[in-house]
């Protein structure tokens, strides 16, 4: 496996020391997740999205480059600071882009010191903790690849449990590579054997909800057909998609949930990512 291009922070930071003061200028906080499928190829797409939606904090997945190769200056001109966790070889990679102050708490998911894949970043900002994740797909690598996915989800559950036990306002946004139910994919979009719909993948996603996390989109849109991913080709025009990008909120943040939307505009652009942004709006405390 390729090595992460920045040092990994595995020490848990106490909430009192890590969480930054809440902003007072704006009563709303807008968080976003966006799998860009190569940040260097999609930098202009991201910049247009930032200009149009003006989110406060954005988690990116599948940046597909080292941290130093992320085009941070393109976003700095719009008032956004970038922190990336990269990986050589054009694989994986996550980043956070924010126009509000933030502190990086972790650059790797705890629980496996040998895991060098760039899939997790956790920050403190605006009085909350938030993590951006790129959960393993699980379809490649045979049985070992699927086992890695399940183990990764188990590690994530332990992190979420710790945050909930500490009563910390916590959000986990990203590409989960899981369709939680049959309502989260177009009919016939995936075979029943696919790792994104496998019963064990879905069970581990439900386990996060059973801990007390809230699926932000389904909390506000329980019955709507909403997708965040469409394969290249005619899938987008036919709305033959998947809902695999999610925002899960702790009880403290679920109480503040104002809106959650899928922004399909970036997916409709020329040469887009196969994903599109998911935006969560939280009321101030």
Regions found by a protein language model. Give the residues of each.
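Conserved beta strand-loop-helix elements of the APE1-like EEP
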Residues: 89-104, 235-256, 282-283
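Surface-exposed cleft-lining segments at the edges of enzyme active sites
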Residues: 110-111, 135-153, 189-194
């Amino acid at each position: 496996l390729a090595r992460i291009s920045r040092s990994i922070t595995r020490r848990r930071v106490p909430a009192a020391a890590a969480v930054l003061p809440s902003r007072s200028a704006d009563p709303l906080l807008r968080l976003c997740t966006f799998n860009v499928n190569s940040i260097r190829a999609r930098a202009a797409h991201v910049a247009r999205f930032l200009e149009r939606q003006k989110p406060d904090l954005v988690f990116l997945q599948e940046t597909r480059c080292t941290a130093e190769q992320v085009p941070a200056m393109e976003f700095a001109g719009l008032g956004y600071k970038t922190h990336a966790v990269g990986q050589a070889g054009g694989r994986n990679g996550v980043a956070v882009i924010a126009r509000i102050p933030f502190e990086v708490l972790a650059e790797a998911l705890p629980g496996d010191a040998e895991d060098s894949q760039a899939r997790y970043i956790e920050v403190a900002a605006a009085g909350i903790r938030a993590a951006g994740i790129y959960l393993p797909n699980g379809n490649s690598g045979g049985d070992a690849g699927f086992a890695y996915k399940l183990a990764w989800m188990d590690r994530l559950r332990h992190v979420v449990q710790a945050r909930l036990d500490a009563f910390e306002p916590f959000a986990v946004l990203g590409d989960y590579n899981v369709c939680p139910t049959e309502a989260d994919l177009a009919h016939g979009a995936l075979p029943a054997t696919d790792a994104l719909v496998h019963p064990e993948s879905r069970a581990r996603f439900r386990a996060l909800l059973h801990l007390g996390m809230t699926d932000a989109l389904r909390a506000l849109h329980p019955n709507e057909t909403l997708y965040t991913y469409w394969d290249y080709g005619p899938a987008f025009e036919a709305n033959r998609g998947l809902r695999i990008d999610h925002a899960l909120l702790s009880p403290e943040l679920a109480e503040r949930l104002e809106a959650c939307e899928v922004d399909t505009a970036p997916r409709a652009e020329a040469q887009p990512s196969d994903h599109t942004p998911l935006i969560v709006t939280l009321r101030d405390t």
